[in-house]
Regions:
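Basic nucleic-acid-binding interfaces
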Residues: 2-172
């Protein structure tokens, strides 16, 4: 939970009249998001060792940026993360930070042959507080899920649960 500093008194002049306003600067936020993004053209680029290292680095980077990340999972072709969106960042800003920093680090660390890149776009899905454990478990058991269905199949089901239209765009 994010909490801002304590109460502040602000003096404001409106049309030659002096008014004093006491504003509560306590900001409370709990905005869980299940984030999903994929490699460019959904190419399997990360082996297990590289994925494990990238996962640790992403968690560390998130903490540095004030983004609480409960769990993340890197697969050869996509990534899942469960975060609590901070009040000072938009979803787009968080995704730029996470995708940009991780691709930069993967390339700088030479974890893959050639150049690593994420595909365009991402999925950001709201998670109720009562479902946080369920989603965290879902992310933790990704390997098991992918024995049963592909990422494209999984994502199509996932997107439809949120009432969104699935566009399978392989060449992004």
């Amino acid at each position: 939970m994010h909490k801002a500093p304590s109460r502040t008194t602000i003096t404001v002049r409106i049309q030659r009249r002096r008014k004093e306003l006491t504003l509560s600067t306590h900001s409370y936020s709990r905005c869980w998001l299940h984030l999903v993004w994929e490699t460019l053209r959904r190419e399997p680029m990360l082996d297990k060792r590289a994925a494990a290292r990238a996962s640790v680095k992403l968690a560390e980077y998130s903490q540095e940026k004030g983004i609480y990340m409960k769990i993340n999972y890197f697969n050869a072709e996509h990534t899942h993360a469960l975060i609590d969106l901070p009040t000072n960042l938009t979803i787009e800003q968080v995704m730029q930070l996470l995708k940009g920093s991780s691709s930069h680090w993967i390339n700088q660390s030479h974890l893959v042959k050639g150049r690593f890149a994420w595909g365009k776009g991402y999925g950001a899905f709201s998670v109720s507080q009562s479902d946080v454990s369920k989603v965290a478990n879902y992310i933790a058991t990704q390997e098991e899920h992918h024995r049963k269905r592909s990422f494209a199949q999984e994502y199509e089901i996932f997107v439809s649960r949120y009432g969104l239209e699935w566009r399978n765009e392989e060449n992004r």
